[in-house]
Design a protein with these regions (language model features):
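Generic marker of residues within folded, mature protein domains
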Residues: 76-78, 135
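OB-fold/S1-family RNA-binding modules
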Residues: 1-71, 92, 126-252
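DNA polymerase sliding clamps and clamp-related checkpoint/processivity subunits
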Residues: 69-76, 83
Length: 252
């Protein structure tokens, strides 16, 4: 039939899913659709697939993949090859359990010992879980793994966190536009800059001299107003101050 154009949508499984905030799905679709249409795409649909992983159908899969990768530190697209962008699902008894999706939508479940990662990073103390928590390895957060160890990009992020010497706050279940809204609503004064790891996880670096406690209280109020149900975790840099960090320890 003339004048009829059928649009074929191709599906991408993102290495991203909600932690606790259901409303983040619709907000994430708004953000992805906005940047996709701006780049020349025309049709996009977002949903949750098996295991809760975010599924995106778009008329230009390559364009969408490129846009998402350009906006994230971790590769947000599921893949069979290493490294894998994963979600931390449980921490306890010296172990960290995490999950990531495969391109067919199935879920891989794996576990590593906190000690293995901590030692790899040069930590010589006894509180392995506390050390990893200070680096942002917390339940609900995204990590990047290769052969059950930190990937090269994950090592780079860990090193950046230490060398910058700034307190941080990790954000979970917030979209990039919601992070921007929080900054513009009264949090910019605390913020040096922030990084988006995946579509729903971010690291905010506080300005030198900013109070982590005051920043956390202000952030809590803003999240309650702008994105109820989203999570955050304040991370103090002081926990690193007595550790002998050397770039030689990081094989990047």
């Amino acid at each position: 039939m003339r004048g009829f154009l059928k649009v074929f949508l191709r599906m991408l499984i993102l290495a991203e899913r909600l932690w606790r905030r259901v409303e983040a799905v619709s907000r994430l679709e708004e953000w992805i659709r906005g940047i996709f249409l701006e780049a020349g795409g025309s049709s996009l649909k977002l949903s949750q697939g098996e295991g809760g992983w975010i599924t995106v159908e778009a008329d230009d899969e390559r364009l969408l993949s490129s846009i998402l990768r350009l906006n994230m530190r971790f590769d947000p697209i599921s893949s069979m090859s290493q490294p894998h962008t994963a979600k931390v699902v449980k921490i306890g008894r010296g172990r960290v359990s995490y999950e990531y999706p495969l391109p067919d939508g199935s879920t891989m479940r794996k576990t590593f010992h906190s000690r293995d990662w901590a030692v790899q990073l040069g930590y010589e103390g006894d509180d392995f879980e506390g050390f990893l928590e200070a680096l942002g390895v917390v339940e609900g957060m995204s990590i990047s793994t290769s052969l059950n160890m930190p990937s090269s990009i994950q090592m780079r992020i860990f090193l950046d966190e230490v060398l910058r010497g700034l307190d941080r706050i990790v954000l979970i279940d917030l979209t990039p536009q919601e992070v921007e809204e929080i900054l513009e609503s009264g949090f910019k004064g605390f913020t040096a800059f922030y990084e988006t790891l995946t579509p729903l996880t971010h690291i905010v670096y506080l300005k030198l001299g900013s109070s982590l406690d005051k920043a956390s209280k202000r952030l809590e109020a803003l999240i309650h107003s702008i994105a109820p149900g989203a999570s955050y975790r304040p991370l103090s840099w002081r926990r690193f101050s007595k550790i002998d960090w050397s770039e030689a320890r990081f094989e990047i």
